[in-house]
């Protein structure tokens, strides 16, 4: 199947310079390999509010999986490569960096300096989750969103652990609430149990399921049409 990067270069890249404002999109591994549709939708939304979308010169995995498994040296190499591209985007191209993954954004903003000892103070505030970026534009009155009025649905929102640490769940929730005819249920979220790569490991399966049990019960009880979250591993 086609990666998001391949799709973007073939179908979207050529038209992005037509917009008056621009951002760089840190898509991450999940969008690139597992769910390109989310990346395509992100491009559509940003284009709709007048922003051209560009890829970073070189994007590596944010490194969170390496950090979680103690592979600090490898994670540091990837972080340094990402920050080189981020600095080029921000300082040379004058483009802030947005992402759709709370985990990737938290890692790049907070875990690079705290866990890897890499100074990102010069760019940290220009690395942002897309929902916060869009919310700020709406609050400033710079853009307006147009919605279809023929969609009625019940959505349950789960706050991921990294989103909780960022303190940015408010922005995703506010955007969902702004959609007409959406009945939004904000779950009393605890960890889903996957905990990065922890829950992928066979020996951790029972513990992982136990951690997520409360969240799973809530999701079943609210019987929503969709469950929304900003984290790929929670999904």
Predicted regions, residues:
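Iron-sulfur cluster-binding electron-transfer modules in prokaryotic oxidoreductases
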Residues: 1-235
């Amino acid at each position: 199947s086609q990666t998001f990067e391949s799709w973007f270069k073939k179908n979207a890249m050529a038209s992005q310079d037509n917009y008056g404002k621009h951002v760089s999109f840190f898509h991450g591994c999940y969008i690139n390999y597992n769910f390109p549709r989310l990346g395509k939708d992100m491009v559509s939304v940003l284009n709709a509010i007048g922003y051209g979308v560009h890829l970073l010169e070189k994007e590596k995995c944010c490194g969170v999986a390496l950090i979680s498994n103690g592979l600090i040296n490898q994670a540091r190499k990837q972080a340094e490569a990402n920050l080189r591209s981020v600095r080029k985007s921000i300082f040379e191209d004058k483009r802030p960096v947005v992402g759709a993954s709370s985990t990737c954004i938290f890692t790049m903003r907070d875990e690079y300096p705290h866990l890897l000892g890499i100074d990102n103070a010069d760019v940290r505030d220009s690395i942002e989750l897309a929902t916060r970026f869009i919310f700020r534009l709406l609050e400033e009155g710079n853009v307006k969103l147009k919605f279809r009025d023929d969609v009625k649905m019940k959505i349950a929102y789960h706050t991921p652990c990294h989103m909780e640490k960022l303190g940015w769940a408010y922005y995703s929730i506010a955007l969902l609430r702004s959609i007409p005819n959406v009945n939004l249920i904000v779950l009393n979220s605890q960890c889903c149990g996957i905990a990065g790569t922890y829950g992928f490991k066979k020996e951790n399966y029972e513990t992982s399921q136990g951690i997520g049990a409360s969240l799973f019960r809530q999701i079943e009880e609210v019987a929503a049409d969709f469950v929304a979250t900003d984290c790929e591993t929670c999904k």
